[in-house]
Amino acid sequence: MADRYILAVESSCDETSVAVLKNEKELLSNIIASQVESHKRFGGVVPEVASRHHVEVVTLCIKDALSEAGIVAEQLDAVAVTYGPGLVGALLVGMAAAKAFAWAHGLPLIPVNHMAGHLMAAREVQELEYPLLALLVSGGHTELVYVSEPGNYKIVGETRDDAVGEAYDKVGRVMGLTYPAGREIDELAHKGKDVYDFPRAMIKEDHLEFSFSGLKSAFINLHHNAEQKGEVLVTEDLCASFQAAVLDILLAKTKKALERYPVKTLVVAGGVAANQGLRERLAEEITDVDVVIPPLRLCGDNAGMIALAAAIECDKKHFADLDLNAKPSLAFAGFEE
């Protein structure tokens, strides 16, 4: 049987990435052009700046991905692209590049949900056993997803307000930490103590929804009041207390979901899955199912994960026409025509 090659393009936010996947899960290349330095001074992603950077580098990323993979365009079998969710301008740049490439080389186009990419990044670790449950945690999303079979996704719980990664960045900004703040807060938390009493919203309620806005507000109020009174707060303890509250919420809801949906595998993915505190708590507290977390290099936004998700859609022959539109608010409902 001939080898199958898929070129994948990801541009949903502030990373321009192109990857080449051989067969089901062998990543031959995964080029990532990060824009973090460009957005740091703004304390967050500026959509117009992100789109401009994507335009500047996406063609070069495609060339580099093919070169590193050691193949030429004529060997490709399909082109995959993130079509949502994400920033509409950023999505459109990657989609335009992918559609043009697919048209020029007569290749089918595979539309991929960005969050399916995060989830399916776990395929590089091991073959996944279905049905499974996934905790997806990133800058824009916090959701529990039940996957009955490859490509069939159902949200069973999600945040009512802030995503967990968004909360990290907002409290990081209050403390004067560099954007994105997640890694630094995690590192500082390991040096501090959980001494500040922050709320754990809805932690004892029976549903599977999350809320982080109250925790974020409590943190901001504590920090503001201390500044007004001239009090000095220990940054390491602030981070430890904030992270303890976040992880208590995530673990409590995940455990409830596992009780409700008896599965053998829990996938934890998304940018926040790189958090060492989260990984430690998962290892300590969830021992009756197989916990699968993508390697650090596949936790943040990257085209490798899009390619891994695309392989499943390709198997099902889920292709799109070249008039495919970006869906910035795309929700998990499996494949959308």
Swiss-Prot record:
PROSITE patterns named in the record: GLYCOPROTEASE
Keyword Amino-acid biosynthesis found: no
SUPFAM superfamilies: Actin-like ATPase domain
Cofactor(s) in the UniProt record: Fe(2+)
GO cellular component: cytoplasm
EC number assigned by the record: 2.3.1.234
Residues annotated as binding substrate: L136, V137, S138, G139, G140, D169, G182, D186, N275
GO molecular function, one term: N(6)-L-threonylcarbamoyladenine synthase activity
Superkingdom of this protein's organism: Bacteria
GO biological process: tRNA threonylcarbamoyladenosine modification
InterPro entries, per database record: ATPase_NBD, Gcp-like_dom, KAE1/TsaD, Peptidase_M22_CS, TsaD
Keyword Metal-binding annotated: yes
Record-listed Fe cation binding positions: H114, H118, D301
Location within or outside the cell: Cytoplasm
First-tier enzyme category under EC: transferase
Keyword annotations: Acyltransferase, Cytoplasm, Iron, Metal-binding, Transferase, tRNA processing
Primary localisation category: cytoplasm
Catalysed reactions, semicolon-separated: L-threonylcarbamoyladenylate + adenosine(37) in tRNA = N(6)-L-threonylcarbamoyladenosine(37) in tRNA + AMP + H(+)
Cofactor note: Binds 1 Fe(2+) ion per subunit.
Annotated family: Belongs to the KAE1 / TsaD family.
Function according to Swiss-Prot or TrEMBL: Required for the formation of a threonylcarbamoyl group on adenosine at position 37 (t(6)A37) in tRNAs that read codons beginning with adenine. Is involved in the transfer of the threonylcarbamoyl moiety of threonylcarbamoyl-AMP (TC-AMP) to the N6 group of A37, together with TsaE and TsaB. TsaD likely plays a direct catalytic role in this reaction.
Record-linked HAMAP family: TsaD (MF_01445)
The name this protein goes by in its record: tRNA N6-adenosine threonylcarbamoyltransferase
Gene that encodes it: tsaD
